[in-house]
Amino acid sequence: LNTVDIVTPNIDELAWLTHLPVVDEASLLTAINRLRGKGAKSVYVKGGHAHWQKNVSDIFVCASHTLRFSQPKYANGNLRGTGCMLASALAAFIVHDYCIEDALTLANAYVSEVRNHTLPKQCAAANANAISNELTTYFAQTNGFPAKPESFPLVTFHQRGATANEKERDKDSLLKASSCKESHFPALTHTHLGIYPVVDSVQWIARLWPTGVKIMQLRVKQGSQEDIRQQIKEAIELVKHTDCQLFINDYWELAIELGAYGVHLGQEDIDTADLNAIRSAGLRLGISTHGFAEIQRVRALNPSYIALGHIFPTNTKDMPSKPQGVARLKKYVQLCDGIPTVAIGGINLSRIGDVAKTGVNGIAVVSAITQAAHPLKAYKALVQEAGFA
């Protein structure tokens, strides 16, 4: 076990490997911990045999965190070969340099897409021959790269120690926010966003809004709490009677207090922010993502937009992921399935044309404007090159 990176048993195989009964969520976690105690670096348990679950919930556990991947149960037919197929798909996605979280998300989606493609046809054939689907075993067929948004699982993230059972899962703030009756955040006023400047002071807001820019983000990095509050207040006042949609980075409580249009949060921020308070205040919400797993984490929230990055290497901030590239960006846009998208990270004049061709609604830029010799000319050149003019 200690020679492999990940073990992928189903429920029955987990029970056999650990010599423990697995009959509910508590015993499932106990068995996973037993297997990790035997040397497994990480464990991914497929939930298809977990009779106690409402949905099919696969679980991934490693030293630092736990992820759950949930899909609706498929009632018709018994599809054989999906476990081997998932493990093979997982290995293939890892070889293609996807991080483990994204590789698992894609492997789960791949099997789901195979199931949704295979079973209806084979069940129809069985019905035509008056064969009961409950008594029939079908065999999985290979498929291409998963592309249908409905094939992808809901992904939930948990730190170690916060994964024990269904009740514990309900305490997850993101699940609470996405299960709210009014789960949609307010829509953007303009979805054809164009160039999206991300700036660090109200002075930049004042310089740029006369260009007719449709969206900007104020990301204040330094200053006292009072100075930050004043900058946010002034920025909101500056654009209040314009068409510019101003998002405040991180400071969601000040954004609510001062009546901002919207707030932008990173992955770490959504763990601690009161998302229902943001929604109740009528603020729009943009969220940063860095791959398939994080997109699937936030899609259920129906945010006002999803930021996709970082596309190219960037020195603007330390990033938790590798550059994604334009090919992956195009897949991310398709996965967001109607939720407005913003590309971000290392985008400049020479790269912006290829980024725009992916179909993103907006393209966020930082140094391409703020470090330009003539920022307003740089903004206009970016608009022109991207085809947003």
Question: Model-flagged regions — what are they?
Answer:
Residues 246-261, 290-302, 335-337, 342, ...:
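Catalytic cores of alpha/beta
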Residues 220, 267-275, 307-320, 352, ...:
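Glycine-rich phosphate-binding active-site loops on the catalytic face of alpha/beta enzymes
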Residues 7, 191-199, 216-218, 246-248, ...:
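Hydrophobic faces of well-ordered beta-strands that scaffold small-molecule active sites
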Residues 28-36, 99-115, 380:
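Short, well-structured alpha-helical segments that form the helix of a local strand-helix-strand
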Residues 15-16, 76-100:
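Short, small-residue alpha-helix embedded
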